[in-house]
Design a protein with these regions (language model features):
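N-terminal export signals
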Residues: 2-21
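Generic low-polarity alpha-helical segments
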Residues: 1-2, 160
């Protein structure tokens, strides 16, 4: 039921036009990390967003073609009232935190990244969930004219992922707005 959110963390993390969060206000969560952080360069240039193409370098090369202003998140489904949040309002719903998590790709590679965001549960608690709600579904934006990878048939677009409600409400589940102190 969270629609058009799938690319928010990628595109926003690197857009000076949308730098509305004061990073001095970001709470750094103390963590015992044994591994080194993955470099900012690697985090921002080696990733899978097939919306922009099939190569690891495609998102960095093609994401600039996507219109990101204005950006809104549509929320609908098993909730009391459908809601649309402008990004600048969504990011203000809670104090931002920096959390260092290891991203593990199904392909077998991983990165240790300082993410910026807040617990997804904060947003979900602001919505009145129906007793029938079982999943939180994330659906990416579908604009093949801006996201050329969506013209391919490698996936059935738009891309959809989901979490069970208990997974989505877990305090470690992060709604991410940026990385490396950049929002």
């Amino acid at each position: 039921f969270l629609k058009k959110l799938g690319l928010a963390s990628v595109t926003l993390g690197f857009s000076p036009a949308l730098s509305f969060a004061n990073m001095a206000d970001v709470k750094k969560i103390p963590q015992n990390i044994k591994d080194n952080l993955t470099s900012y360069k690697d985090v921002t240039s080696y990733n899978n967003f097939y919306e922009f193409g099939l190569q690891k370098s495609s998102p960095k090369a093609n994401a600039h073609k996507m219109k990101i202003d204005p950006w809104a998140v549509e929320i609908s489904g098993e909730i009391e009232k459908n809601k649309t949040y402008a990004l600048e309002d969504l990011v203000k719903l809670a104090s931002l935190e920096e959390r260092i998590y290891r991203l593990r790709c199904v392909e077998g590679w991983s990165m240790v990244i300082p993410w910026v965001g807040f617990s997804l549960s904060v947003l979900l608690k602001k919505l009145t969930l129906s007793s029938r709600a079982k999943y939180v579904v994330f659906e990416t934006l579908y604009r093949p004219n801006e996201m050329e990878g969506q013209k391919s048939r490698v996936l059935d677009w738009p891309y959809i992922e989901a979490l069970r409600i208990d997974e989505a409400m877990h305090p470690l589940t992060l709604l991410c707005f940026g990385v490396y102190g950049k929002v």
